[in-house]
Design a protein with these regions (language model features):
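Alpha-helical repeat scaffolds in large eukaryotic proteins
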Residues: 8, 106, 110, 135, ...
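Intrinsically disordered, low-complexity regions enriched in proline, serine, glycine
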Residues: 95-96, 114-121, 136-137, 164-170, ...
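Extended low-complexity, proline/serine/acidic/glycine-rich cytosolic segments
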Residues: 1-131
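Aromatic/His-enriched, Gly/Pro-containing loop or helix-boundary segments
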Residues: 130-142
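Extended amphipathic alpha-helical bundle segments that form the ordered cores
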Residues: 145-152, 157-186
Length: 186
């Protein structure tokens, strides 16, 4: 963990790009499509369960959680792996809609609109380090929530593969668990 801060970002990006290239599936030609309704998402005002939400993440959940994981392995580093279309809006997704949508999905996940993630005690108390970070809600272990967490993982993968470095405000110990780093008391 202590070495992690000393590795230059360009080195990290090169390693990630190498991993994307080596795991790329060349036989996948069909791009996933995502159709969203911004007006429906804007009507939501209170934090809700994923199954009751009309937000963008809940609308995207079916597409993000249902395809086989291999569908997300198409493309080279920086290529968009999914096309985005918004209901009632005219636009060609040449990358901008994709980038904006990934950012909006991340923002929604950590805004309090959904109950998938909870603020860390440090965030609540506004003290010490790792402020503004979140942990998965441990009380959510039903099938719909587990599907939503799977979709979050795929959203992280989409961000890495397309080199859209979005802000997933997960606490450092959550990242450590996701990357199989031994946990410490730091």
């Amino acid at each position: 963990r202590k070495v992690r801060e000393r590795i230059f970002i360009e080195t990290k990006k090169a390693l990630l790009a190498s991993a994307v290239v080596s795991t790329r599936r060349k036989d996948l030609h069909k791009q996933l499509g995502l159709k969203l309704d911004r007006s429906l998402a804007n009507k939501q005002k209170k934090p809700r369960e994923v199954s009751l939400s009309s937000g963008l993440f809940s609308q995207a959940l079916g597409t993000l959680a249902s395809p086989k994981a291999s569908q997300f392995l198409r493309g080279l580093p920086g290529e968009q792996v999914m096309s985005i279309e918004y209901k009632g809006e005219i636009g060609v997704d040449a990358g901008g809609l994709f980038n904006d949508t990934l950012t909006a999905l991340c923002d929604e996940l950590f805004s309090g609109e959904l109950n998938l993630f909870l603020e860390t005690p440090n965030t609540k108390a506004k003290s010490r380090r790792n402020l503004d970070t979140f942990v998965p809600n441990p009380s959510l272990n039903d099938p719909v929530s587990m599907n939503a967490f799977r979709a979050v993982g795929r959203l992280i993968a989409l961000s890495v593969r397309s080199q859209q470095y979005n802000t997933f405000k997960l606490a450092p110990n959550v990242w450590d668990m996701l990357t199989s780093v031994d946990l410490t008391n730091d």
